[in-house]
């Protein structure tokens, strides 16, 4: 039976293979940080990638929606939202709120984690208070792990985790290694009745922001986890069964490397598409062109008059005219 350790871990976890992979992960993460700075407006990335991450992270939990449904939910609130797209939108809202709170407080506390969870799940509860939670093999329904059952245990472990997250003096291991430890510890504590996976994946990215490895929450591991879902759960459990921290840490470091590279390619693609649209609007609709309008179109895959009014500080008739001319220009 796995006994959750008090952090920091006592065993050596920065092995030679881990240190070697750390070099690649940090290199790619630094390149991503630089690529983000080259964007004309970072909020374009935050909006685009947070929705993509929300979609992918929810898919890990078998909550499936399409981009079209998600963008409609973002645009029209409850009018066109499916139950799945509402859940995914709540995840994106939780991510943005968490980012704002971490930047404001320069801390990632349990109160912030609980607030993230409440937005994800759209309820007002906190850490589990009733026993009975178990983790099962999806295929066989066999119980593979039983997390702490009492509220006191959960609170004790989460207090230790909170300190480990925020007090750098507790451990001198690399922040990316710490992120892997934090993620495993959170999953093992399983502090909430539901939504632990999604909340934990938000904690991952916010921890990178907290440590200055990224300025904005733009690195998301959910697609990597989906692609390697079986291995993810196997390695998660292998730490509990066999104490194999090295394989778990290497898995997440490789995910950081791959995901950073994929996100850099995506950023270059967005910039190229923005340049193409900028050229087209300036040549064909020069009377309405502005960088702010271009940013709005890329910040909101589906835009509307209210967004134009608010972000460009123009009247409704002007915003309506902009969208009408853009629609005519697209059709011609």
Model regions and ranges:
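FIC/Doc superfamily catalytic core
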Residues: 1-332
